[in-house]
Amino acid sequence: MKIAIDAMGGDHAPKAVVLGAMKAIKEYSDLHITLVGKEEEIRQYLTSEERITILHTDEKIESTDEPVRAVRRKKQASMVLAAQQVKDGVADACISAGSTGALMAAGLFVVGRMEGIERPALSPTMPTVDGEGFVMLDVGANVDAKPIHLYQYAVMGSVYAEKVRGIKNPRVGLLNVGTEDGKGNELSKQVFAMLKDAPINFVGNVESRDLLQGVADVVVCDGFTGNVALKSLEGTALALFSMLKEQLMSSFTSKLAAAVLKPKLMVLKDKMDYSEYGGAALFGLKAPVIKAHGSSNDQSIFSAIRQTREMVAKEVIPTISSVMEKEPLQ
């Protein structure tokens, strides 16, 4: 199995990418990795070249670049070359912690959209209080959506949750303003009716306040709604941890309490740590394309590689294609 990785994407590249890749190579004997980027910088952190190949390029996509224009003009950019490796059949999948918009453009223009899928979806795995997490799609690939798009998101998310996350008969929920049937705008109502007849375990509408309680294994929404919900959850979690830290450091007695509680707090932090869940998959493309978090450390990169390897090994893309062929809905 071969995975191409944009070694220059992310806040801590190439160090975090190289260290994460070496960790994955040690863990998985069937894995070969191509690191795409500036060879001189990559070699500063590469202590072993076992099953690791470097594809040198001096060009990369900057966070300030306009995504679509950058992908079209910077043909030798590390992210574009990683996607090209997939298109050419040299690699089975690709990963980048670089610009989300640019990776979506590279996925569409270079890797290509899966036949029958109208719009790809960006899908991270979000943490829950029980540590199991849930798949959420779309969180920003498309801010506007039609009912058919959300129907396809639900099917793709269900296949992923079962194949990669090992959830038997995953529960699929539609993010809405209430749990009752008939709630929401016209889009929500149409999608609800379609999902009731879909080849999935549809559990109905779910509210954003219940997401972290693990009310569903897959949560479906349009990209605008998903992005707002995602950032609200992230912001709330950061604010709560910040307030908790402030209170625990406010006095001598509270500092003593913090010392006692530290092991439990670390368990809680690990449960809510996105780095353990991998990256956000771009569903709807011809091959696995994974967007790692921009601030990914080596553990985050390792988790993204593990996730990508599972997608390839469990044949997620062929399975989605097969399901969509059996259940055509235009």
UniProtKB/Swiss-Prot annotation:
Its EC number is 2.3.1.274. Pfam families: FA_synthesis. Keywords: Cytoplasm, Lipid biosynthesis, Lipid metabolism, Phospholipid biosynthesis, Phospholipid metabolism, Transferase. Pathway: Lipid metabolism; phospholipid metabolism. It catalyses: a fatty acyl-[ACP] + phosphate = an acyl phosphate + holo-[ACP]. One of its GO terms (cellular component) is cytoplasm. It is an enzyme of class 2 (transferase). It is found in: Cytoplasm. InterPro entries: FA_synthesis, Phospholipid_synth_PlsX-like. GO terms for biological process: fatty acid biosynthetic process; phospholipid biosynthetic process. It comes from the Bacteria. One of its GO terms (molecular function) is phosphate:acyl-[acyl carrier protein] acyltransferase activity. Catalyzes the reversible formation of acyl-phosphate (acyl-PO(4)) from acyl-[acyl-carrier-protein] (acyl-ACP). This enzyme utilizes acyl-ACP as fatty acyl donor, but not acyl-CoA. Homodimer. Probably interacts with PlsY. HAMAP family: PlsX. Belongs to the PlsX family. This is Phosphate acyltransferase. The gene is plsX.
